[in-house]
Every structure is written in C-alpha cells, then in structure tokens.
Amino acid sequence: MRISLKKSGMLKLGLSLVAMTVAASVQAKTLVYCSEGSPEGFNPQLFTSGTTYDASSVPLYNRLVEFKIGTTEVIPGLAEKWEVSEDGKTYTFHLRKGVKWHDNKEFKPTRELNADDVVFSFDRQKNAQNPYHKVSGGSYEYFEGMGLPELISEVKKVDDNTVQFVLTRPEAPFLADLAMDFASILSKEYADAMMKAGTPEKLDLNPIGTGPFQLQQYQKDSRIRYKAFDGYWGTKPQIDTLVFSITPDASVRYAKLQKNECQVMPYPNPADIARMKQDKSINLMEMPGLNVGYLSYNVQKNHLMT
C-alpha cells in the first residue's frame, strides 16, 4: 500500500490512517484526507472493504485489543488486561474503566462502556435470534467467514467490567481476530434506544463509538466530517477536525495533494509514483499489505477439467 503525504508544518503522519489521531503537529487544527470512495455504512461488523473500515472502525470505534500501529502485535484496547485458561478455551477480559461514548442529536449515553456492550456486539453477529441480527441486511462476512460462530461457544458477562469468551477449542490467533475491524464494540444502550424508537438501522448509519473522533456530517460521494472527541480515553487527537474528501479518481487526489487541498491521499496511480518521489514537498510512504491475492482453478465444474 502507498500513502502520499504533503509535507508541511501542520502534518506529521505515521504508517497508517490511525496515526492521524496522534501524529499531527500541535498547530494542526484540520486534516483533510482524500479518500478513494464512500463507505458502505458506519458499522464495521457489516462490511469488508478497507474504504468502509477507514471511515468507521478507525476513527469512530475501538476493540477489546488492538494492533500496534504498523505491526501485527496485539496490545490492550478497551480491555486493559486479559487471562487465558490453561486449556486455551476461556479468555477473560478486564475492561478499562471510565471509557465514554459519543453522543448525537438522537441519543445521550447515561453510562460508560461496560460488559453488556461487548456481549451485545458479538451476540448480534453470532445469534440469529438477536433482535439486531438481521438489521441492515444482517451480513457478517468476516465473523462468519473466519468460523467464529462455531468457534465461540459463549460470550458472557462476569461483572460490569469483566467479560469471558468460551471457545469450543483452543485457537492460537484468537486475540488477533479480536483486533480486527469487525470486532469493534458498539453501544448496547444506543442499540436498545433505537430499537425502542423503531429505527434500529440508525445504530449502523448514525454511529456512536468510543473512538478518538465522532461523526459530525456525512454527504455521500462528497465528504465526511469528524470532530475530535473530548472524552476519548486514549491519546487525545492533536487535530480538532478530520475531513474525508471523497475523491475516487487518483489523478484528482494527486492534484488536490499538490494544491494542499488535502494533506493525505492513498492509492496513487502507479504512473505518478516517480514524480511523487522527485517532489520534495511530498512524502511517499510504502508498507506491505496483509491481503493475499491469487488465481485458482475451478475444480467444481467437470467440463473445465477436460
């Protein structure tokens, strides 16, 4: 993956979009990111595209555990510590205290994060009887594709600040699984309020999370505007406003970058790479992707084998 950055006194950026929350200089007030497209929604449980994750799970939500930026090392997130049973089948997570939720025009939280939110976030994906399971299409491709409905026997609340995952078998990468975008934690209190109001889909369209930014405005195919969340439990953002300027054409993204209309752009055209490297005002960053692409034979059709 390649990310291009406009060098200026207002911006310092690490290896991923997450770094925007911690690496901008103190002088920076607004950071504009030329996104490559509109998100499919704002609930990362329901989608699989990186474009959607960049706009939802990264700025808006947290997970029990996280990946250390630029690595696959698992570090504490909403869970400050955890234990694994000797048989490798029970994971006990101890939640951080004092983690606050965003709010919006329709909902004001009355409590902080607790174990009910964690249980709800996974039960929605696993349990076909959960009232939210079929809301917004009810497609949980990552959760189901990774075999988690069969792996996770139970997610249970021990107390307000402790939650347990009971597995059907030991699973070495389970912690890393919980650091992925689809494992973002949503508010059960907000979900209950929207269900009671008869508008459950708003949970997925008007997001409320615990992340460093909260959603202010979304204009499809135009822009997304976020503001720094004053109550964020982690390292405070060093910018006040984050704007996604939705720009599908890579050439247009590059032109905006050159004019400083945006300070960050992903996925430049390969033909532009050489020019970018020669431009001292642009910092071109490269990092290996985690996805693997391949071609395979279709062995399900007999006539293709003759």
Residue ranges and their predicted role:
Residues I69-G70, T90, R96-Y132, E201-P207, ...:
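Extracytoplasmic/periplasmic ligand-capture domains
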Residues S38-D54, L78, K105-K108, F174-S184, ...:
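A structural "hinge/loop" feature
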Residues C34-E86, D123, I208-T210:
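N-terminal lobe/hinge region of extracytoplasmic solute-binding protein
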Residues R2-G14:
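Bacterial N-terminal signal peptides that target proteins for export
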Residues N127, P131-A191:
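Surface-exposed binding/hinge segments that line
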Residues V26-A28:
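Boundary at the C-terminal end of the N-terminal hydrophobic targeting segment
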